[in-house]
Amino acid sequence: MQPTRVLFKRSVWKGPHIVPLPIQRPEPGKKIAPIRTQARSATILPNFVGLKFQVHNGKDYIDLTVTEEMVGHKLGEFSATRKPFIWGKKK
């Protein structure tokens, strides 16, 4: 049996790093507010697919909607903490 992609980052006997988050599934036809979190190290689990998060980047909360391709990654991978450098014009 091959270890999954998630287990390459941590030892197999440790398992994935899971942070308990207040997850509520909305009833059909109802919307719930996005889950605000500073837990950038939380692993995205399959039951998070379709949920909306607001992940803290050190200054602001960045909106994030979880898709199937994100499963196994960390929440912090999808909210950049640094601004990209852009060459400015001289005044």
From Swiss-Prot:
Regions crossing the membrane: none
Any idea where this protein resides?
A: Mitochondrion
Name of a matching Pfam family: Ribosomal_S19
- PROSITE patterns in alphabetical order: RIBOSOMAL_S19 (PS00323)
Gene Ontology CC, one term: mitochondrial small ribosomal subunit
Q: Which UniProt keywords apply?
A: Mitochondrion, Ribonucleoprotein, Ribosomal protein
Q: Which SUPFAM superfamilies match?
A: Ribosomal protein S19
User: Which GO molecular function entries does the Swiss-Prot or TrEMBL record give?
Assistant: RNA binding; structural constituent of ribosome
| Gene3D superfamilies reported in the protein's UniProt record | 30s Ribosomal Protein S19, Chain A
Instruction: List, in alphabetical order, the GO biological process terms annotated in this UniProt record.
Output: ribosomal small subunit assembly; translation
Subunit structure of this entry?
Component of the mitochondrial small ribosomal subunit (mt-SSU). Mature N.crassa 74S mitochondrial ribosomes consist of a small (37S) and a large (54S) subunit. The 37S small subunit contains a 16S ribosomal RNA (16S mt-rRNA) and 32 different proteins. The 54S large subunit contains a 23S rRNA (23S mt-rRNA) and 42 different proteins.
Q: What does this protein do?
A: Component of the mitochondrial ribosome (mitoribosome), a dedicated translation machinery responsible for the synthesis of mitochondrial genome-encoded proteins, including at least some of the essential transmembrane subunits of the mitochondrial respiratory chain. The mitoribosomes are attached to the mitochondrial inner membrane and translation products are cotranslationally integrated into the membrane.
* Similarity section: Belongs to the universal ribosomal protein uS19 family.
**Sorted alphabetically, which HAMAP family does this protein's record hold?**
Ribosomal_uS19
- Which PANTHER family does the record associate with it? RIBOSOMAL PROTEIN S19P FAMILY MEMBER, SMALL RIBOSOMAL SUBUNIT PROTEIN US19M
List the protein's name.
Small ribosomal subunit protein uS19m
User: What's the source species for this entry?
Assistant: Neurospora crassa (strain ATCC 24698 / 74-OR23-1A / CBS 708.71 / DSM 1257 / FGSC 987)
